Amino acid sequence: MKNFALIGAGICGLRCAELLEKGGLTVQLFDKARGVGGRLATRRHERWRFDHGSPSLHGDDDKWLTCISRYPKWTSGDNSMNTHLPENGVNQMAKDHASQLNVQLNCLIRSIERSNEGWHLLDEDGNPYGPFETLIITAPCPQTQMLIETLETALLQQLKDVRMTPAWVMMLVVAEPLIATHQLCPNHSLIRRISAEHSKPGRALDPEEHSYVLETTSEWSKQHEEDSPAAVEASILSALMRITTTAVNPMHCAVHRWRYAHTENPLGRPYLIDPQLKLAVTGDWCLGDGASSAYRSGELLANALLDPEPDDVRETQHFR
């Protein structure tokens, strides 16, 4: 039976692995995090839950809509979007997809090597994995580039123009409402979006508790990527008070940095394959439109490997 190693258990990697397994292949996933999902992330603190990566599940792709429509609807404020949310948070979707997969968490793959036997992986503690016949990498593009930089592959040249940007997010609980809608995207140089977490399905709080996730703009985040959490917290709170024109007295406040939050310049195609090395790379940075594009890229790559269309035969024939 053909065996695959797949680095990255975000929704792109999970969807790809799910379809490969259904096609009769064996897939071992590796992820450096404590849980699956990547930016489909939900953080819990006491009785509060915060979707501090992707704020919701939305998009127009038919297959993606079929997938997310199993979850309750959420009116984010933009009635043009089909927006859904699991009651336990966006991370629940990733958990649902991972439930039947073999995922090794807390495992940071530091190096990869191709031999006559296949792919060999080494984690940060020196533990080896392999050999695997085929390797798929769904990590953020800069991390993918670092993993494959020692290989003789044309993929490196094809990835050179992809650009990803960071984002800081704040998880905030206050006694008074800050915005009148479920979500606000102010025209502001620092704050990109404010999401009312307490308005989401299954998250009704005490009437005197209002929880929010605030995300900073890409431009501000690039300029302040290496600032301390305390400095970022002070800057966001100051900007928030100017936007709402009210005093903000946090009951809870924490910030988190996503180093690779958004794609400024996407690849423009759903995946890349090096058939000689039996190596494929994909991720949300390929099409660059969040979770729905990540899901689509993972699905298209899996389909190409399982049942290539005529245009894909040349690329995938060495995988068969």
Listing of model-derived features with the role each one plays in the protein:
Residues 1-12:
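Beta1/beta-strand and adjacent pyrophosphate-binding region of the FAD-binding site
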Residues 2, 125-134:
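Core beta-strand elements of the Rossmann-like FAD/NAD(P) dinucleotide-binding domain
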Residues 5-7, 18-45:
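Glycine-rich FAD pyrophosphate-binding loop
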Residues 37, 132-184, 246-248:
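Central helical "cap/lid" subdomain
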Residues 240-277:
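Flavin (FAD/FMN) cofactor-binding core of flavoprotein oxidoreductases
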